[in-house]
């Protein structure tokens, strides 16, 4: 039985669901599709000539390089190593190029310098100042930025010329002006040159300048061409927004990298009264976290690092600021142009940052914070106030141009203290010197000078020792220029004095006279370095204790504030001698045999 074929009638079609019926496109969608197709065809037709030109240029360039390579490989002398006189003549630029230049502006080197070219003999490194080649005429050309052959490498003229950049179709020559220079004794300077087109249309987006011998000047001798570093050429309209390298102190803050003129970051800085690079650096020194928070999340950490690095290349002026902590101007801190801490003034004398010890740095840190909180009290030194004072002018110059001061040229200590006693405000200004070594009266000098005289020949008993010390005070004199042995950087007075006392005491205890003296008290002393020797902290012996060191230090500080001179130094010696005698007697008494009652 044959099955009937499915016959679809109009009635059945009408009964189909709405989703299965063939939809008729709307008129609007048909128009949109037609417009899209037409637009795509127009776009393809407009891009086709551009693609054809780019491809043809690249193919020509590749073929020319391939042809030059083949021609060079067939040549018996592929490279111009030496001329007929055995010299290797090369042109070199002696001026670095800036990272950016602008169309319509004068072509200049870094920081606006003139661009110089020299002809040298690579075998000797000397400038060729004689001969026909020293007066050659050179052509200035524009090269591609990706001409990355090193200057110490050799290349052929064809290879050099393959990187030359020609003007675009319908454009003027890329470089206009004095495109030829003539060497004079092997040296030449580029004249007035101007770029007429930017470098954004070539692959590397950068240009190089190159020089090569003009036609007719390189036939009888071989000279290798020269090229500069790559640089970008921008449209002259961008010069109004040009960044400065390095920035000047009074440049507007948007001259710094990553800060666009009238941008969001620039407006934030202006709102905080940060108008110039100087304002930026000062806040960076005083409170870098505040500056970072001010810029906010709109500046990434990488952008922040670039901006700060660029700002720190700024060349500072010679201004100084001093903040005094008292009315006598005996103590204060010194800052540079951007409020960086540069040194400490103590007792009317200037100590540079590099010469401060640990304790002085802690004190200086407190004073610096105090100065920043009360900056309106700081005094500005711009050189005008001190011009009438030749001594002060010389010392301020030494502050701006740091240099080491030897111990032999240090001033007499007593003279310095006499000057401090009669200082006025101007006198304190004269006291600002840039010396890496503090110059008050050093107590270790007294210890070094007089321990050498007294301790090796220590008397046989304590009373004779005291009398000899008192008599030596009258006969000895203090010489401020008789310096103690040089000390290490950052070593304090207490460390030097304690070390000196320890060494001299060890020598003293090893003498026969001291051994006999101690035996009279029943004390047995071992040599240094053995168990229970001098300087150990064991209870069975005595040593140089910290409290005694503190007494010496306090005495030094009190006496230092009272004055100076031979009388004061004599009293210091006498006190030290008496304290040492009392110390010896006390320790000897502790070691005396005691009678113990035994049941």
From Swiss-Prot:
Does Glycoprotein count among this protein's keywords? Answer: no
- One of the record's GO cellular component terms: nucleus
Q: Where in the cell is it found?
A: Nucleus
Source taxon at top rank: Eukaryota
Question: Mind telling me which InterPro entries this protein's record contains?
Answer: Calmod_bind_C, Calmod_bind_M, Calmodulin_bind_N, CBP60
* Residue segments, region DNA-binding: 150-273
Q: Where is this region: Disordered?
A: 1-21
Its main localization is: nucleus
This protein's assembly is summarised as: Interacts with calmodulin (CaM).
State the function annotated in the UniProt record.
Answer: Transcription activator that binds DNA in a sequence-specific manner, likely 5'-GAAATTTTGG-3', to promote the expression of target genes.
Which family does the similarity line name? Belongs to the plant ACBP60 protein family.
- Protein name per the record: Calmodulin-binding protein 60 E
* Source organism per UniProt: Arabidopsis thaliana
């Amino acid at each position: 039985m044959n099955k009937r074929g499915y016959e679809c009638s109009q009635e059945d079609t009408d009964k189909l669901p709405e989703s299965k019926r063939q939809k008729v496109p709307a008129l609007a969608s048909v128009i949109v599709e037609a417009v899209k197709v037409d637009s795509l065809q127009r776009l393809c037709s407009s891009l086709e000539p551009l693609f054809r030109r780019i491809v043809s240029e690249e193919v020509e360039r590749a073929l020319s390089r391939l042809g030059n390579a083949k021609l060079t490989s067939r040549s018996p002398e592929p490279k111009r190593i030496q001329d007929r006189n055995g010299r290797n003549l090369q042109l070199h630029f002696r001026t670095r190029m800036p990272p950016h230049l602008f169309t319509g502006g004068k072509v200049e080197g870094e920081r606006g310098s003139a661009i110089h070219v020299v002809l040298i003999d690579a075998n000797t490194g000397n400038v060729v100042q004689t001969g026909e080649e020293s007066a050659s005429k050179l052509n200035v050309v524009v090269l591609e930025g990706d001409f990355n052959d090193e200057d110490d490498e050799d290349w052929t003229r064809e290879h050099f010329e393959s990187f030359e950049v020609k003007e675009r179709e319908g454009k003027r020559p890329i470089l206009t002006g004095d495109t030829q220079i003539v060497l004079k004794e092997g040296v030449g300077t580029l004249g007035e040159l101007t770029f007429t087109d930017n470098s954004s249309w070539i692959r590397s987006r950068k240009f190089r300048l190159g020089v090569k011998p003009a036609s007719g000047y390189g036939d009888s001798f071989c000279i290798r061409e020269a090229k500069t570093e790559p640089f970008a050429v921008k449209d002259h309209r961008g010069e109004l927004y040009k960044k400065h390298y390095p920035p000047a102190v009074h440049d507007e803050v948007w001259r710094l990298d990553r800060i666009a003129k009238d941008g969001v970051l620039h407006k934030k800085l202006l709102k905080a009264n940060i108008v110039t690079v100087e304002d930026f650096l000062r806040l960076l020194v005083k409170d870098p976290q505040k500056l970072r928070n001010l810029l906010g999340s709109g500046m990434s950490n990488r952008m922040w690092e670039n901006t700060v690095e660029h700002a720190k290349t700024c060349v500072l002026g010679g201004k100084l600021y001093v903040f005094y902590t008292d009315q006598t101007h005996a103590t204060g801190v010194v800052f540079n142009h951007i409020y960086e801490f540069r040194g400490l003034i103590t007792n009317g004398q200037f100590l540079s940052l590099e010469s401060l010890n640990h304790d002085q740095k802690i004190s200086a840190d407190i004073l610096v914070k105090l100065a920043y909180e009360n900056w309106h009290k700081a005094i500005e030194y711009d050189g005008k106030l001190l011009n009438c004072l030749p001594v002060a002018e010389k010392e301020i110059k030494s502050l701006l141009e740091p240099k080491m001061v030897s111990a032999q040229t240090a001033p007499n200590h007593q003279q310095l203290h006499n000057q401090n006693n009669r200082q006025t405000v101007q006198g304190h200004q004269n006291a600002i010197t840039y010396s890496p070594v503090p110059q008050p009266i050093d107590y270790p000098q007294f210890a070094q000078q007089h321990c050498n005289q007294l301790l090796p020949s220590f008397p046989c008993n304590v009373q004779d020792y005291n009398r000899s010390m008192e008599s030596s005070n009258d006969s000895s004199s203090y010489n401020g220029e008789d310096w103690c042995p040089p000390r290490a950087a950052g070593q304090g007075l207490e460390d030097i004095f304690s070390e000196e006392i320890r060494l001299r005491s060890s020598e003293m205890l090893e003498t026969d006279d001291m051994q006999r003296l101690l035996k009279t008290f029943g004390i047995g002393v071992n040599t240094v370095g053995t168990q229970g020797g001098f300087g150990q902290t064991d209870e069975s012996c005595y040593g140089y204790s910290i409290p005694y060191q503190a007494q010496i230090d306090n005495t030094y500080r009190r006496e230092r504030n009272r004055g100076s001179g031979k009388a004061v130094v004599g009293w210091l010696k006498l006190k030290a001698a008496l304290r040492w005698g009392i110390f010896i007697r006390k320790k000897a008494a502790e070691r005396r045999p005691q009678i113990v009652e035994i049941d």
